[in-house]
Amino acid sequence: MPHNSIRSGHGGLNQLGGAFVNGRPLPEVVRQRIVDLAHQGVRPCDISRQLRVSHGCVSKILGRYYETGSIRPGVIGGSKPKVATPKVVEKIGDYKRQNPTMFAWEIRDRLLAEGVCDNDTVPSVSSINRIIRTKVQQPFNLPMDSCVATKSLSPGHTLIPSSAVTPPESPQSDSLGSTYSINGLLGIAQPGSDSKRKMDDSDQDSCRLSIDSQSSSSGPRKHLRTDAFSQHHLEPLECPFERQHYPEAYASPSHTKGEQGLYPLPLLNSAALDDGKATLTPSNTPLGRNLSTHQTYPVVADPHSPFAIKQETPEVSSSSSTPSSLSSSAFLDLQQVGGAGVPAGASVPPFNAFPHAASVYGQFTGQALLSGREMVGPTLPGYPPHIPTSGQGSYASSAIAGMVAGSEYSGNAYGHTPYSSYGEAWRFPNSSLLSSPYYYSSTSRPSAPPTTATAFDHL
């Protein structure tokens, strides 16, 4: 066989006994014989034994033949022959312009069908795609676009150069502000250089937009500054924060006006703040023990510990004639009375959920306060309007102001009728309610309900 003759060069015998020359392809005759045996149906392993060619060489030759149809060897250690000739590139461009959706493998088949290329010179699918991408479909040329872009840009808008080059400033940007500033975008003229605020070097590095960090000292450059506000703009922004919208209700050592921490909030929020201060006297008692009279809250107290009411009367006397309308400047202080009140062996009635029925009100004299309803006023729901009896009379402000000491309070028990024994006429004085017996039936009460006048007499 021709390939058995060892030519000059490095050669030898393979594992099958066949001769080969190192770095040289198989002869053309052996390649054709391999392809012919494969067409006859001989397996690659049998072809390798018959021709004494390595199995890898047979597989490589057959694989290339099935893929490209060529049996020529590839070039080792050099460049392949150029298949993308100008004629082939022009044809590929014509095919793509005629049918833009044409695939690369269809272009390859058409090149072979029209005889533009043969099996050895036809470009591969990847080569055709590369030719279409780089040479056929070129939307723009970089040099031309750079020239057009440079011409279309205004003098104030230039392309960003490399980091080593600083873009020059134009005269228009000096008069209308920096290109990247709000004043420059809105066309607002900036004030003179004497009113500009200056920053130190550390703030300039963090707050400016600059391409070149090593700027030259040829002239001042404009940067985007986050704090570039004039005093004219800062004053209206800071005014709302200087006003105190929420006055402090608790006194603290840092108060510049210490008297404001001891007055009730409604007086501080009123328009006539100065007039209210003139009628009030600051109290040294902690605020937790001071309550203004119009802020009425039910007091739940232990029935075993009597309390005394001490009223701090201001310099200006109240003009009210009823206990329910105390002066807003008065403060009530509840203090526990020790030793005076209920005796040790006396029986104390059970605790009632309603404040006016608790025994704590039994420690008050009848002339001072009648019941809890006198403190909270007649406007609360569930309380009838107060009709004083003949023994009670009317109460002047002096009677309330001159409270007796805690040791002189009467220790008599609370002798009024409990709330649960009042009838429907007491709880429903208004006839406009929707059918009061519908909610509270009178069948469960054997005694007849008292009249309105009788119910009020119990008070």
UniProtKB/Swiss-Prot annotation:
Localization: Nucleus
Span list, region RED subdomain: 87-135
Span list, region Disordered: 159-223
A GO BP annotation: pronephric field specification
PAI subdomain: annotated segments: 12-68
CDD domains found in the cross-reference section: PAX
Primary location class: nucleus
Function noted in UniProt: Thought to encode a transcription factor. It may have a role in kidney cell differentiation. May play a regulatory role in mammalian development.
Protein name: Paired box protein Pax-8
Gene name of the record: PAX8
